[in-house]
């Protein structure tokens, strides 16, 4: 694996990420959510993609793609491992979202190219990274209250907002993916909350991928 070449690709791609608001439709009619995971000891990569109406946040479509994993796990290069499955799920959607939430990092990455940014560039869609763990940068400790907020900083640059979305839950790291500003990324996530730790787009993507009760009930209603 030529990590020097991959690192150079990341730096080049990161220079093309748009950190300003460039939504084609604002407000969006549809917001998507995406989640990626691995099965069979990492040999299979799956990606779940959901489509929600906005502002109702009603689930209207979902797709799950499973493909052979194309590269091993290497810290800092996860987007190269994840985007092929995301692309396979994306291509199956009959209606593409106007804005996509990705479970993972956006520019809050050592080379400013997490999976939300990488995939946003690939398909040229506005994306937001909604990550559960810090990858780089520093932030001031948050209070335990829901709504506590702190900027994630690295070398004098704000990479994300660290936001405690729910009491007694770890915070989320909300960042520009592509064509969405840092402040707007936070605002969109906040608009898509319904009392859970995760915003509805990525919560539904996780529910679809994991076969959670909420998704099972939704399937029963559709029959």
Curated annotation (Swiss-Prot):
Give the matching InterPro entries.
Answer: Endonuclease-V
Locate the residues binding Mg(2+): 35, 103
Some GO term, biological process aspect, for this entry: which one? DNA repair
- Which keywords fit this entry according to its UniProt record? Cytoplasm, DNA damage, DNA repair, Endonuclease, Hydrolase, Magnesium, Metal-binding, Nuclease
List the residue(s) that the UniProt entry marks as the site Interaction with target DNA: 73
GO CC list: cytoplasm
An MF annotation (GO) of this entry: single-stranded RNA binding
Cofactor(s) recorded for this entry are: Mg(2+)
Q: A Pfam family in this protein? A: Endonuclease_5
Q: Which reaction does it catalyse?
A: Endonucleolytic cleavage at apurinic or apyrimidinic sites to products with a 5'-phosphate
The task this protein performs is described as: DNA repair enzyme involved in the repair of deaminated bases. Selectively cleaves double-stranded DNA at the second phosphodiester bond 3' to a deoxyinosine leaving behind the intact lesion on the nicked DNA.
Name the NCBIfam families on file.
PRK11617.1
Q: Member of which family? A: Belongs to the endonuclease V family.
What is the name of the protein in this document? Endonuclease V
């Amino acid at each position: 694996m030529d990590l020097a070449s991959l690192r150079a690709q990341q730096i080049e791609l990161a220079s093309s990420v748009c950190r300003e608001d460039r939504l084609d439709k604002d407000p969006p009619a549809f917001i998507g959510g995406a989640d990626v995971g691995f099965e069979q000891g990492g040999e299979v990569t799956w990606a779940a993609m959901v489509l929600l109406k906005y502002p109702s946040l009603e689930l209207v479509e979902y797709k799950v793609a499973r493909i052979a994993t194309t590269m091993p796990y290497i810290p800092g290069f996860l987007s190269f491992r994840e985007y092929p499955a995301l692309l396979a799920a994306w291509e199956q959607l009959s209606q593409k979202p106007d804005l996509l939430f990705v479970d993972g990092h956006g520019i809050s990455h050592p080379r400013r190219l997490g999976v939300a940014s990488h995939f946003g560039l690939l398909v040229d869609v506005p994306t937001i990274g909604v990550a559960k763990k810090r990858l780089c940068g520093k932030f001031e400790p948050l209070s335990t209250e829901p709504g506590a907020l702190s900027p994630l900083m690295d070398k004098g640059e704000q990479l994300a907002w660290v936001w405690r979305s729910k009491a007694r839950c770890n915070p989320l790291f909300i960042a520009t993916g592509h064509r969405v500003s840092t402040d707007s990324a936070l605002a969109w996530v906040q608009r898509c909350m319904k009392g859970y730790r995760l915003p509805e787009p990525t919560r539904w993507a996780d529910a679809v991928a994991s076969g959670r009760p909420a998704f099972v009930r939704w399937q029963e209603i559709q029959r």
